[in-house]
Amino acid sequence: MTAVLIERAQADPLATVRLNRPDKRNALTLGMWRDLEQAFKQLEQEDALRCIVVRGAGGNFAAGADLSEFPALRASATQAPAYGRQMIAALIAIRDCRHPTIAAIEGLCVGGGLEIALMCDLRLGAADCRFGIPIQKVGVAMPYPELAILTQMLGRPTMLALLLEGQLHDAAWAERHGLLTRIATDLEADLSATTTRLAGGSPVSHRHHKLYTQRASEVLQALDSADVQRSYAAVETADYREGIAAFFERRTPKFPGN
């Protein structure tokens, strides 16, 4: 089963990119990050396209990273940057796509799933959707490239609330703090109306506004390569090893703090 699908009828100005691991609540694998990047690079080239919807299969957007991959793919500060670079490449491909994008959110929108949603231009959420970045429960730190992009969007107070508390928040909280554009009483009806509005607008206008609102918001100071590398160091700590072990053993982690 393909875990990232592009759904588009012939000559349809709308495409849907669907995260398709419903049995795992669309938990994200490294392969899915690669497929997401390629999907958006492919759709970027289609001149007749007017809007892209990103959504999950089976009633959830995405439940975050598939932690079962971490012992093999994110076990050291040497491995982790390669995984991180692929994540960032996919996120930037979504953010910088010239076509307007909408995240249609149901159920869980957590961790990497929330990052994907935040890269979309508009985010419509069903009333029962939930949001969070429970990374502190795994004992690892969000690498700087991801942290910079999200802090730029949400602001430091909201990012710290998400990262330090690790709670799942409801749609009303998400709307107040900018994670959602709006709550949709009827998600499918709101999505249909929104895609119609976007498709009816000028592609030139859309491209201009997407590009220059992004340029205007790029105010965070870039770190040098050594700082970026240091931001991956948490994967070599006892806290990270304990967090991963606790996940697989289905118990509450006891973090030593080093």
Per-region residue spans from a language model:
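Terminal low-complexity tails and localization/encapsulation signals of metabolic enzymes
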Residues: 1-3, 245-258
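Glycine- (often His-adjacent) and acidic-residue-rich active-site loop
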Residues: 48, 56-93
